[in-house]
């Protein structure tokens, strides 16, 4: 029956302790860890980890992330920014005097996209960026788009 661990005590007095003759069973012949990735282990790196070494593209120095902040909101979700208790009230009285003001920036959205439909009720939408299609759909419903900084 094979044993789980080698019995080191039994190897006492036997020079190579079951590891062969002179020079066999050396410590770390290929180096430790990722050593030799660009040298003697190159075939493995190229085959199983393509693209591990090297660079691609250009660096963007002093990139200001705030300039690229633009979370999007589609038109079909626009009315979810109005509280539910007031939503029915606005939908019933579809007049320009009582049009709801939707501030998308305060809700955490940077741009409005034109996917989906909106009810045929005038709304005043305040946003930083609005796509062409979204603006057309809001205007078709009798609404107004205000661009804010």
UniProtKB/Swiss-Prot annotation:
Segments of this protein annotated with the region Disordered: 1-39
GO terms, molecular function: RNA binding; structural constituent of ribosome
Any one GO BP annotation for this protein: cytoplasmic translation
Location(s) in or outside the cell: Cytoplasm
Motif (Nuclear localization signal): 7-13, 24-30
Keyword terms, alphabetized: Cytoplasm, Isopeptide bond, Ribonucleoprotein, Ribosomal protein, Ubl conjugation
Domain of life assignment: Eukaryota
Protein role: Component of the ribosome, a large ribonucleoprotein complex responsible for the synthesis of proteins in the cell. The small ribosomal subunit (SSU) binds messenger RNAs (mRNAs) and translates the encoded message by selecting cognate aminoacyl-transfer RNA (tRNA) molecules. The large subunit (LSU) contains the ribosomal catalytic site termed the peptidyl transferase center (PTC), which catalyzes the formation of peptide bonds, thereby polymerizing the amino acids delivered by tRNAs into a polypeptide chain.
Subunit structure, interactors included: Component of the large ribosomal subunit (LSU). Mature yeast ribosomes consist of a small (40S) and a large (60S) subunit. The 40S small subunit contains 1 molecule of ribosomal RNA (18S rRNA) and 33 different proteins (encoded by 57 genes). The large 60S subunit contains 3 rRNA molecules (25S, 5.8S and 5S rRNA) and 46 different proteins (encoded by 81 genes).
Protein's name in the database: Large ribosomal subunit protein uL15
């Amino acid at each position: 029956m094979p044993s789980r661990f080698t019995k080191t005590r039994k190897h006492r007095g036997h020079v190579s302790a079951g590891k062969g003759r002179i020079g066999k069973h050396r410590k770390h012949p290929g180096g430790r860890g990722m050593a030799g990735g660009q040298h003697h282990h190159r075939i493995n790196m190229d085959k199983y980890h393509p693209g591990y070494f090297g660079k691609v593209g250009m660096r963007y120095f002093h990139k200001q992330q705030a300039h690229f902040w633009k979370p999007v909101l589609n038109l079909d979700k626009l009315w979810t920014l109005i509280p539910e208790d007031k939503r029915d009230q606005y939908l019933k009285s579809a007049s320009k005097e009582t049009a709801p003001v939707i501030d998308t920036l305060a809700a955490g959205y940077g741009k409005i996209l034109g996917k989906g439909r909106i009810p045929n009720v005038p709304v005043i939408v305040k946003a930083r960026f609005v796509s062409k299609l979204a603006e057309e759909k809001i205007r078709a419903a009798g609404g107004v788009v205000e661009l804010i900084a």
